[in-house]
Design a protein with these regions (language model features):
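C-terminal binding/interaction regions
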Residues: 1-35, 84-154
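Alpha-helix C-terminal capping segments
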Residues: 50, 79-86
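Short, well-ordered amphipathic alpha-helical segments that serve as non-catalytic structural scaffolds
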Residues: 28-31, 73-81
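Short beta-strand scaffold segments in enzyme catalytic cores
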Residues: 42-50
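Short Gly/Pro-enriched turn/cap motifs at secondary-structure boundaries
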Residues: 38-39
């Protein structure tokens, strides 16, 4: 029987003192990636968003022929969760790759980072970028959106 291990590479001590269902989040993100609608780029992205209450929300990217109306996996997950009444979140897991085959780490775009800033504390919200099911890195939002502008600035 093969022993399963998770290679965890954390930035700034991410995960310290927290309990995240990392394996389940990665599995959910991979499942969501399989649902992506990407007839133009072929680049599939899946996300699994963890609410403060422990509920996981999946999101996938959805492309459109006009490109601008396309939506990223991360925003799909956030909008789904918010439309269900969630407003507080702990973490998100993101996985992506051409034709659904992971090609390294897939980081959120600037628009998705800004949506995260709207609902999440940049000091504590964690972003899991998975290259494979056993290979991932975890960042705090503040690391991916330094000097971010959010609700506290208004």
């Amino acid at each position: 029987m093969k022993e399963e291990t998770m290679e965890v590479v954390c930035q700034s001590g991410a995960l310290a003192g927290t309990e995240l269902p990392v394996k389940e989040m990665i599995d959910q993100a991979f499942e969501a990636m399989g649902k992506a609608y990407v007839p133009y780029s072929g680049f599939k992205v899946g996300a699994a968003l963890l609410s403060a209450e422990g509920t996981l929300y999946q999101g996938c990217n959805i492309e459109n022929a006009a490109y601008t109306p396309s939506n990223c996996a991360e925003r799909t997950a956030f909008f789904k969760a918010v439309s269900q009444g969630e407003k507080e979140f702990k973490a998100i897991c993101i996985v992506g790759g051409k034709e659904g085959i992971p090609t390294g780490l897939t980081a959120p775009c600037g628009v998705c980072r800004q949506v995260m800033m709207e609902f999440c504390d940049p000091e504590t919200f964690q972003i899991i970028l998975a290259a494979e099911r056993e290979e991932y890195k975890i960042f705090y939002l503040k690391e991916l959106l330094p000097m971010g502008f959010g609700p506290k600035n208004l």
